[in-house]
Amino acid sequence: MTSRRSQEKSYAEAAAAPPPKESASSDVTPAVPADVIYKLLGFTAAMVVGPIGMYFVTVNSGGMSFFHQTSNFSLFETLTRIASPTVAGITAAITANLVLFGYIYVAWLDDREEREAASKRNEKKAQ
């Protein structure tokens, strides 16, 4: 009993063959719009530069030095100088959270605009 080999291409032949030509109406638009990428890059830069910059600005300014302009109370000045890295860390954390909330808000606005545009298109199709 001999079995006949099918006339179809083998796996190696199929893999080596060029892909079948697609129609000219294929969709070549990017999966993510460019403005979304630019916003993401901007917020990424803000997330890196903002908190680190605020940390060093706050550390170098002496923490809460604006509370004791011309005070002779040296204990308060000593405590604010000691707490300066702590205050700077808190400032950096607040800055990071503000950038994060800003990104979430901008993404929410973009999503809302897309939903409104989609609902308008659906209303036009229904008419």
From Swiss-Prot:
Subcellular location per the Swiss-Prot or TrEMBL entry: Endoplasmic reticulum membrane; Endoplasmic reticulum-Golgi intermediate compartment membrane; Cytoplasmic vesicle, COPII-coated vesicle membrane
Segments on the Cytoplasmic side according to the record's topology features: 1-39, 110-127
Transmembrane spans: 40-60, 89-109
A Gene Ontology cellular-component term: endoplasmic reticulum membrane
GO biological process, one term: vacuolar proton-transporting V-type ATPase complex assembly
Domain of life: Eukaryota
Lumenal compartment segments: 61-88
Short sequence motif Prevents secretion from ER: positions: 124-127
Listed Basic and acidic residues bias regions: 1-11
Membrane topology qualifier: Multi-pass membrane protein
PANTHER family listed in its UniProt record: VACUOLAR ATPASE ASSEMBLY INTEGRAL MEMBRANE PROTEIN VMA21
Task of the protein: Required for the assembly of the V0 complex of the vacuolar ATPase (V-ATPase) in the endoplasmic reticulum.
Protein name: Vacuolar ATPase assembly integral membrane protein vma21
